[in-house]
Amino acid sequence: MIEINYPQYPFKIRPNEASTSIGKVQEQAKDQIFDPFRKKWVVLTPEEWVRQNILQYLNQVCQYPTALIAIEKSIQLGELTKRFDILIYNNDKPWMIIECKKANVAINDKTITQLYQYQQVLEAQYLFASNGHETVGAEIKTGKLHALQNFPAYL
């Protein structure tokens, strides 16, 4: 397991008290958080809160370049279209995939299987999963997963 000391960051959150009607269903609008990486406001879900904290850790503490971070992009897994949470590039190639879960979702075999499916398409060297409290990571060497105790240095 990887221990993360999250940096202080002045997140911009705007409450959204309006509600919208969709057909006969009344839907309460959600608060939003400004994502400085995507440069837009996004719905503040529990998973998004984990994602934003992980992104700040990677950028501020690990010094991963902002320009080489992709967030919530679609990929094809056979006939299925899926979205990864975070992808870090190195030399224009996928280098690290990070799957974010909300705080009360355990990082388990299902999460690792999901990451490994993404890896089959993206061929990244590193795989990580976090729910904000628990973070696990692995490097792929000769087709096998090797557990990591830290995020690798960005080269």
What are these regions (language model features)?
Residues M1-Y126, G132-L155:
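A short, conserved, highly charged catalytic patch centered on acidic carboxylates
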